[in-house]
Amino acid sequence: MASFINNPLTSLCNTKSERNNLFKISLYEAQSLGFSKLNGSRKVAFPSVVCKAVSVPTKSSTEIEGLNIAEDVTQLIGNTPMVYLNTIAKGCVANIAAKLEIMEPCCSVKDRIGFSMIVDAEEKGLISPGKTVLVEPTSGNTGIGLAFIAASRGYKLILTMPASMSLERRVILKAFGAELVLTDPAKGMKGAVSKAEEILNNTPDAYILQQFDNPANPKIHYETTGPEIWEDTKGKIDILVAGIGTGGTITGTGRFLKEQNPNIKIIGVEPTESNVLSGGKPGPHKIQGIGAGFIPGNLDQDVMDEVIEISSDEAVETARTLALQEGLLVGISSGAAALAAIQVGKRPENAGKLIGVVFPSYGERYLSSILFQSIREECEKMKPEL
């Protein structure tokens, strides 16, 4: 293990509150700039901006008093920690560190884009609370990310989702007040998208956020996720592994990291059963959140150096192993990303390198899915001891 591994990789910022304010500031400062401008003509020194900002436009009483209290739930988004994988990574010649998006306020990486897409549309004057009806197709996590932001800002939200997604997703979405329309699971995300467009056309004052094509999706990862990984690894990351759903995470994060170091390798993950990025055909699979069955507009394939295929069964088994061996309760797509990272970590040419892997969502929202089916059935059969 490389010598730097022995030292904790801590943030340059003093408090989580400080870092979360910066998440909010960096997004607002960039609203008027297109993603291409951020990536091209304007050079943004993200490590210094993200870590050492010393002023904010206005300060609440809690900030003035020095209390470490967020002003609202949106300030809790981002700045998630990284942790090394240990037992499960035995046999790897590289070191693997997971970016724990499971520790977002609503437990998934989609909290970032739920916030960014709504704020971006507000700043452009396209939506307003109490008037606009937000509409979006989702596999669940983006819907949840939108639902808690919509609830906190006063929007009505209508979501379309394939009926194959977990029961927990339905419950959470409705708990936040979202209206949920289930679609034919055989049609996958394409069916959910089609239904959302139908609702949009028949609903007054409706606005669709279009996570698969909205530039605010990859932009927030370029502004926050990428800089966070770069900062927390002290720029020592060699390889990034991430699943491909909307394409936002891998595009925005990968683009930022490659700007810092062009030698960093960006590796995407897709289901074997729906391997469209590898030249295959779309098909049903069990890895919720990735493998939409089409190439999303937000995905910049030029950012990626490689795409690895992981089967549903492999992803499920790896996610279960992460809970048992690492104490990390994660979703199926995290299992897919972890296995891909482990495969890359065993390649001889990667000896001593640092691999970052994104764990997109928390496992508790998969309790009714195949991921924990055997455990659930066992628990349902349990009887009290008399």
UniProtKB/Swiss-Prot annotation:
Reactions that this protein is recorded to catalyse: O-acetyl-L-serine + hydrogen sulfide = L-cysteine + acetate
Cofactor(s) required for function per UniProt: pyridoxal 5'-phosphate
PANTHER family referenced in this protein's UniProt entry, alphabetically: CYSTATHIONINE BETA-SYNTHASE (PTHR10314)
Residue sites binding pyridoxal 5'-phosphate per the record: 141, 245-249, 333
GO MF annotation list: cysteine synthase activity
Subcellular location: Plastid, Chloroplast stroma; Plastid, Chromoplast
Gene3D superfamilies: 3.40.50.1100
NCBIfam families: cysK, cysKM
Biological process annotations from GO: cysteine biosynthetic process from serine; double fertilization forming a zygote and endosperm; pollen tube growth
EC number(s) on file: 2.5.1.47
Assembly description: Homodimer.
Pathways involved: Amino-acid biosynthesis; L-cysteine biosynthesis; L-cysteine from L-serine: step 2/2
Family from the record: Belongs to the cysteine synthase/cystathionine beta-synthase family.
InterPro entries named among the record's database cross-references: Cys_synth (IPR005856), Cys_Synth/Cystath_Beta-Synth (IPR050214), CysK (IPR005859), P-phosphate_BS (IPR001216), TrpB-like_PALP (IPR001926), TrpB-like_PALP_sf (IPR036052)
Keywords from the named record: Amino-acid biosynthesis, Chloroplast, Chromoplast, Cysteine biosynthesis, Plastid, Pyridoxal phosphate, Transferase, Transit peptide
Cellular-component GO terms for this entry: chloroplast stroma; chromoplast; cytoplasm
Organism expressing this protein natively: Solanum tuberosum (Potato)
Domain of life: Eukaryota
Enzyme class: transferase
Main location: plastid
Name listed for the protein in its UniProt record: Cysteine synthase, chloroplastic/chromoplastic
Record-listed N6-(pyridoxal phosphate)lysine modification sites: 110
Pfam families, per database record: PALP
Coiled-coil residue windows: none
